Regions:
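Generic preference for hydrophobic
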Residues: 37, 51, 72, 196-198
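A membrane-cytosol interface segment of integral membrane proteins
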Residues: 94-115, 120, 218
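Soluble, non-transmembrane catalytic domains of enzymes that act on hydrophobic metabolites at membranes
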Residues: 25, 30, 34-40, 59-61, ...
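Residue-level preference for the first positions of well-ordered beta-strands
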Residues: 48-50, 93, 120-124, 152, ...
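Catalytic-site beta-strand/loop segments enriched in glycine and acidic/polar residues
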Residues: 114-143
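Catalytic core of membrane glycerolipid acyltransferases/transacylases, capturing the structured
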Residues: 1-17, 21-22, 28-31, 44-101
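A cross-family acyltransferase "interaction/gating" segment
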Residues: 83-86, 132-215, 226-235
Length: 239
């Protein structure tokens, strides 16, 4: 915590990425979560990279950053979460009010800047979390910076499992479950395998954002062995 509070804000971009990578791996170990990477994640030196994944838990951002340090676009409500919100803010998360078109434009510009600075950007385009047994329709609006910058979009699927391979629903952060209840459920597990599966990157050159979103969504669904079963609430940027 002291590192995030005092060292991280003053560190160089390269040092920040190293610290986020270290902290994410440390947190997973503390929670008895073992990451299992399948497929090829964005290489450490790859620029203009974006990771797009399904969303199950607040742990997702640390799972992804344990593989490749990443700055995430996340709903503004996360900033108010105990501990996780503070950590996310310190780690450079880009918070967005999805119900306000002006904020969508601000985040669009900021994501472009972050990509151009060489940081990897992470998106959870379902907009809400699930238990991991379904995939909601992807919002398309936040794919625009990737298309504008010709970024490589890496589809990723997240699945939390018990040691026997069954879905660990206790990892999900859904409904009325509070952050403290989520912590208690996670700590109640002897061990959890966190699978993060990567599909080949989607080239955005000359593509429309809706086409990119559709291709990425299909890749994530395939990795999970699922089909999209619903639609996340619409936002102004999707219209």
């Amino acid at each position: 915590m002291l590192i995030l509070r005092f060292v991280y804000p003053r560190a160089t971009p390269e040092r920040r990425r190293a610290l986020m990578h270290w902290w994410s791996r440390k947190l997973l170990a503390i929670l008895n979560i073992t990451p299992q990477v399948e497929g090829a994640a964005p290489a450490a030196g790859e620029t203009q990279a974006m990771i797009v994944a399904n969303h199950v838990s607040w742990i997702d951002i640390f799972l992804i950053s344990s593989v490749r340090p990443t700055r995430f676009v996340a709903k503004s409500e996360i900033r108010a979460w105990p501990l996780a919100g503070w950590i996310a803010e310190r780690a450079g998360t880009l918070f967005i009010r999805r119900d306000q078109m002006r904020d969508m434009a601000r985040i669009d510009a900021r994501v472009r800047e972050v990509l151009q600075e060489g940081d990897c950007v992470g998106l959870f385009p379902e907009g809400i979390t699930t238990e991991g047994d379904e995939l909601l329709k992807f919002h398309t609006s936040l794919f625009e910076p990737a298309v504008a910058n010709g970024a490589h979009v890496h589809p990723a699927a997240i699945r939390y499992e018990h040691p026997d391979g069954t879905l660990c629903r206790q990892m999900s952060f859904i409904g009325d479950r509070t952050f403290m209840e989520s912590i208690e459920l996670i700590l109640g597990q002897k061990s959890v395998r966190a699978r993060i599966m990567f599909a080949p990157p989607v080239d955005t050159a000359g593509a429309a954002r809706r086409d990119v979103a559709k291709r990425v969504e299909a890749s994530v669904a395939s990795l999970l062995g699922l089909e999209p079963r619903g639609r996340a609430p619409s936002t102004p940027g999707d219209r």
